[in-house]
Regions:
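Short beta-strand "acidic-cap" motif of Rossmann-like dinucleotide-binding folds
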Residues: 29-35, 231
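Conserved N-terminal glycine-rich FAD pyrophosphate-binding loop of Rossmann-like flavoproteins
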Residues: 37-70, 236, 247-250
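Conserved redox-cofactor binding core of oxidoreductases
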Residues: 99-185, 190, 197, 241-249
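Glycine-rich Rossmann-fold phosphate-binding loop(s) that bind the pyrophosphate
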Residues: 12-15
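Glycine- and aromatic-enriched mobile tails/lids
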Residues: 2-7, 20-23, 29, 38-40, ...
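Glycine-rich loop(s) and the adjacent beta-strand/alpha-helix scaffold that form part
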Residues: 193-249, 317, 410-433
């Protein structure tokens, strides 16, 4: 290879992309950071509540190993354990790094970092900067990247869209095709590697907490070019958002972490002002059903319980699909200091002061545990080799993924405040591996014929010319709304195969209608319509991945809840019984009377279910449809067992 600096293209200016850009430049590489909008408006800024690390500042006995266990348990054991363990052990150093960069984390009266509790753990391990943690982290990393821009090692291309990878004759990624959203120009960027840190796919649903640019188009394009997509069916539904007709605005888990209580009137016909309803007539259903974790059960659990209260028990506030999230027992000073950001959001969009009256909330589409399939390289002990070129590489050589665009860290359900951690961790961790990958290439990008880049650019120019020529009767924005409503109605909190089959056929109807779309604006300059039509095409394919994965996975795991396959854990069951059961099985038959009969029956069914379904769902694009296969999950460190939070 030529003796020059290695250069990579990073698609996405959120935490994963910025962390990687900083670290790659520190290794004397060159980066181009591509962003659909201003870097400081990347979707990572929307994360409110905090970032996890087991620093144990409050002397509760927390450790990185406990953080690791809580994370894999929260994800229903569907994540590769060596990766998760390494992330949790690196977390304290990441917090201290961000602190040194100037992130304005909240502090105790003594000046130490302050921590709050989040869902799925009994420890205070979430560092936070009021209720704007994501924004503060992005701004700190953005400053570091801008320093490298000043030094000439990095450049940023804001208001540019990633269209696809440039693949050579061997299928190796050699660069990116990008679209200038202002001029309409399409051109290529040669690179030794391309990294997709492009965020999640929440716009597949009609309403969500996510930014309107969270279409998943970049990851879906990779899938259409041959990359594997993993665990698409696992969509996180956040339990607390402001109901709305346009989008759903997040009320951070930090509200419950700071003492917020979820309740409804015990009497479904009680129309009184919530402040006038006495404690005895309030149903704190999470606290009653889960006395250990109370309002801080994991998000999948809380969302299912709220859904049950509203739709099965018919106890929604004033007969509507919402429950109360109550912080009125906290002082205004306390709320403004620790939750000021979300207090202001709720006041602005509802006209009600949450310091004085309980908030009305309901679950909302929030995050995707699934994403592009990515690899990792183990060391001699079966843990993570930070220098492995395989780390975070997709099934397309030279194309990597990080952050919400990849699937590796959260299993079937993400714990709150682990998303910011996984983004920064992957960005920092993968830089060394990418540098080693570029060193290992037998052929440099400089040796690739210019025809490869010209042909790829021409393909996309023709694609956009064809889009602009579309002159049918379908409005693409209305078609997107119809697609999103199909997903909301059929592929949400509670799933059944009949509804999923209905969604599957309806999505194909949308795909047929797409051929009759009309491009409403054919100009080049500052015209978002052709881009949106291309993104809609990607969202149709992504909705097929999500729906088919959900349809084929006949079990209940994490956020994927099919009541027909709920194994109904006995109420007095202790998960440690399952470990004893497995040990007994190793030595032959389980002695008669060792376990209660209903417990034994449950454990047998649980083991059989895990043997079949404790696997990663892998989708590959074949004949215009997702072909689904399954891969084993690395569970070498902790034996998977039933989850229990009460």
């Amino acid at each position: 290879m030529m003796n020059r600096k290695k250069k990579i293209v990073i698609v996405g200016g959120g935490l994963a992309g910025l962390a990687l850009a900083m670290k790659f430049c520190e290794r004397d590489g060159e980066v181009t950071v591509l962003s659909y909008q201003s870097l400081k408006r990347s979707h990572s800024v929307c994360a409110q509540g905090g970032i996890n690390a087991a620093i144990d500042a409050k002397n509760e006995g927390d450790t990185p190993e406990k953080h690791f266990y809580d994370t894999i348990k929260g994800g229903d054991f569907l994540a590769h354990q060596p990766l998760v363990r390494d992330m949790c052990h690196q977390a304290p150093a990441i917090i201290h790094l961000m602190d040194r960069m100037g992130v304005a984390f909240n502090r105790t009266g003594e000046g130490h970092l302050d921590f709050r509790r989040f869902g799925g753990t009994l420890y205070s391990r979430t560092a936070f900067a009021g209720a704007t943690t994501g924004q503060q982290l992005v701004y700190a990393l953005d400053e570091q990247v801008r320093r490298h821009v000043h030094d000439g090692a990095a450049r940023t291309l804001e208001w540019h869209e990633y269209l696809g990878a440039v693949l050579d004759s061997e299928g190796i990624c050699r660069g990116a095709v990008i679209h200038d959203l202002r001029t309409g120009d399409i051109y290529t960027l040669p690179a030794d590697a391309v990294v997709l840190a492009s965020g999640g796919p929440s716009q597949v649903y009609a309403r969500s907490t996510a930014s309107f640019v969270s279409t998943g188009a970049a990851a879906t394009t990779a899938y259409l070019q041959g990359a594997k997509y993993a665990n698409g069916e696992f969509i996180q539904i956040h339990p607390t958002a402001i109901p709305g007709q346009d989008k759903l605005r997040l009320m951070s888990e930090s509200a419950r972490g700071e003492g917020g209580r979820v309740w409804v009137p015990r009497n479904a016909n009680d129309k009184r002002d919530p402040k006038k309803i006495p404690e005895s007539e309030r149903y704190y259903f999470l606290e009653e059903k889960y006395p250990l974790f109370k309002n801080l059960v994991p998000r999948d659990v809380a969302s299912r319980e709220i859904y049950d209260i509203v739709y099965n028990q018919k106890l929604g506030v004033n007969g509507e699909p919402m429950v109360y999230l109550d912080l009125t027992h906290k002082s205004r000073e306390f709320l403004d200091n620790r939750l000021g950001g979300i207090m202001d959001i709720y006041s602005k969009f509802t006209g009600v002061d949450p310091r004085e009256s309980p908030m009305k909330i309901f679950p909302a589409v929030h995050y995707s545990m699934g994403g592009l399939w990515t690899d990792y390289g183990p060391d001699s002990n079966g843990l993570i080799d930070h220098g492995s070129p395989r780390n975070q590489m997709t099934s397309i050589q030279g194309l990597f993924a990080a952050g919400e665009a990849d699937y590796q860290f959260h299993g079937a359900n993400r714990l709150g405040a682990n998303s910011l951690l996984s983004c920064i961790y992957t960005g920092l961790m993968m830089a060394r591996g990418i540098m080693n990958y570029t060193d290992s290439l037998e052929k440099s990008v400089d040796d690739i014929s210019s025809t490869t880049f010209d042909d790829t650019r021409s393909h996309w120019q023709n694609r956009f010319t064809d889009i602009k020529a579309m002159n049918g009767s379908e409005n693409p924005y209305k078609l997107h709304q119809d697609l999103g409503n199909i997903m909301l109605a059929n592929v949400l909190i509670v799933r059944d195969n009949k509804s999923l089959e209905k969604a599957w056929h309806a999505i194909h109807d949308i795909e047929t209608r797409f051929k009759d779309v009309k491009c409403l604006d054919t100009n080049d300059w500052a015209n978002p319509t052709p881009s949106f039509i291309n993104q809609l095409y990607c969202m149709i394919h992504l909705s097929k991945i999500i729906t088919k994965g959900a349809l084929m996975r006949d079990e209940f795991r994490g956020s994927h809840y099919k009541p027909a396959f709920d194994m109904n854990q006995p109420k007095d069951f202790d998960p440690h019984e399952y470990i004893d059961y497995l040990e007994q099985r190793q030595y032959g038959e389980v002695p008669e009377g060792k376990f209660p009969r209903d417990h034994l029956d449950y454990m047998k069914r649980f083991q059989e279910n895990n043997e079949k379904w404790l696997k990663t769902t892998v989708a590959q694009h074949k004949d215009n449809e997702p072909e689904i296969t399954y891969e084993e999950v690395n569970t070498s460190l902790v034996t998977p067992r039933p989850r229990k939070y009460d």
